[in-house]
């Protein structure tokens, strides 16, 4: 019975030692880089906004242009 307790104790000690040893050798994760906003995404957002404004103005002005008698010369 004494040998069974010593084997169980040794197995438990080995398991705990292996877990602690694997945690000690682990590397910490590198921190994530801070989010940055580059100029191209800002420029693209402004371009989309200007295209929407141009589209809305086109739809607002077009009925006025179509109803009047419009001539180039």
Curated annotation (Swiss-Prot):
GO terms for cellular component: plasma membrane; side of membrane. The modification 4-hydroxyproline is found at residues 31, 33, 35. Keywords: Cell membrane, Glycoprotein, GPI-anchor, Hydroxylation, Lipoprotein, Membrane, Proteoglycan, Pyrrolidone carboxylic acid, Signal. It comes from the Eukaryota. Contains 4-hydroxyproline; hydroxylated on Pro-31, Pro-33 and Pro-35. O-glycosylated on hydroxyprolines; noncontiguous hydroxylproline residues are glycosylated with arabinogalactan. It is found in: Cell membrane. Glycans are attached at residues 31, 33, 35. The modification Pyrrolidone carboxylic acid is found at residue 27. InterPro entries: AGP16/20/22/41. This is Arabinogalactan protein 16. It comes from Arabidopsis thaliana.
